[in-house]
């Protein structure tokens, strides 16, 4: 399971305000518009930071995430009377990282000139240098708006399926992540995480199952199993010749 506290660089007992500050700092650091030379890494980090913030900033989601992680670490089913005494499932559905970013900043993109009414460098990063002429005709802004960033395409649409569209056609499109965990009365523990994305028009689903100390990773392409790894060892797949 992803350690969202590590992603944001905060301790597990971090306050809601500390989590907000961590997200603000990292979202600005890894905003794709700010990292055109490291596009792929920036997109990955920006998305991961947004997901961490969505979970840890929500009291209910954070509680479930914390408890699920604790059960995973001890490998048990939880004490009697705890939420893990009976098996349960909780799914995290993530929004477009750009939507999270805009919402955090009041519906605006802080990298656009309109947000500040002037030079974003002066207002946002505390640089009080003169911005005279920054809005002159033909001037190139610090960065384009996020919706125009090539890696994410123009416009972001949330679908009823729970998936989020954030990619350009032919590259990546739908993306989702779900996690379930639980322990039974016999002390059995099972954690399931599933991620789905569209790559070059193909639906790639990766499912990671951890049950009683054994890890199983399945990768499907358009519903067909392409890879199976058990405890770190890739398994030979039987080819259906019919």
Curated annotation (Swiss-Prot):
Q: Name one GO cellular component term.
A: centrosome
Gene3D superfamilies in the cross-refs:
DnaJ domain (1.10.287.110)
Q: Specify the signal sequence span.
A: none
Name the organs or tissues of expression: Testis specific. Expression is confined to the germline without any contribution of the somatic components.
Query: Keyword Nuclease on this protein?
Result: no
InterPro entries xref list:
DnaJ_domain (IPR001623), DnaJ_domain_CS (IPR018253), DNJB2/6-like (IPR043183), J_dom_sf (IPR036869)
Asked if the record carries the keyword Ligase, the reply is: no
> Residue limits of the J domain?
1-69
For this protein, the record's Pfam families field holds:
DnaJ
Which keywords appear in this protein's UniProt record, sorted alphabetically? Chaperone
Can you cite a GO biological process for this protein?
Answer: chaperone-mediated protein folding
Record-level Gene Ontology MF annotations: Hsp70 protein binding; unfolded protein binding
Outline what the protein does.
May operate as a co-chaperone of the male germ cell- and haploid stage-specific Hsp70 proteins.
Q: What is this protein called?
A: DnaJ homolog subfamily B member 3
Q: What species is given as this protein's source?
A: Mus musculus (Mouse)
């Amino acid at each position: 399971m992803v350690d969202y506290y590590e992603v944001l660089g905060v301790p597990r007992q971090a306050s809601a305000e500390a989590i907000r500050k961590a997200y603000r700092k990292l979202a600005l650091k890894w905003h794709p518009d700010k990292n055109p030379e490291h596009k792929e890494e920036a997109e990955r980090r920006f998305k991961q930071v947004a997901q961490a913030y969505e979970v840890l900033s929500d009291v209910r989601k954070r509680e479930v995430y914390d408890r699920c992680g604790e059960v995973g670490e001890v490998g048990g089913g939880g004490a009697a009377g705890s939420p893990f005494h009976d098996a349960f499932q909780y799914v995290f559905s993530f929004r477009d990282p750009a939507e999270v970013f805009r919402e955090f900043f009041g519906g605006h993109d802080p990298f656009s000139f309109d947000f500040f009414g002037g030079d974003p460098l002066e207002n946002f990063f505390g640089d009080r240098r003169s911005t005279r002429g920054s809005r002159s005709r033909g001037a190139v802004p610090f960065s384009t708006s996020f919706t125009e960033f090539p890696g994410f395409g123009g416009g972001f649409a949330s679908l009823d399926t729970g998936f989020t569209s954030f990619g350009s056609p032919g590259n990546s499109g739908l993306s989702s992540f779900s996690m379930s965990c639980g322990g039974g009365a016999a002390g059995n523990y099972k954690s399931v995480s599933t991620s789905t994305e569209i790559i070059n028009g193909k639906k790639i689903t990766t499912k990671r199952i951890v049950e009683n100390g054994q890890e199983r990773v399945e990768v499907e392409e358009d519903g067909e199993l392409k890879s199976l790894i058990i405890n770190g060892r890739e398994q030979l797949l039987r080819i259906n010749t019919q």
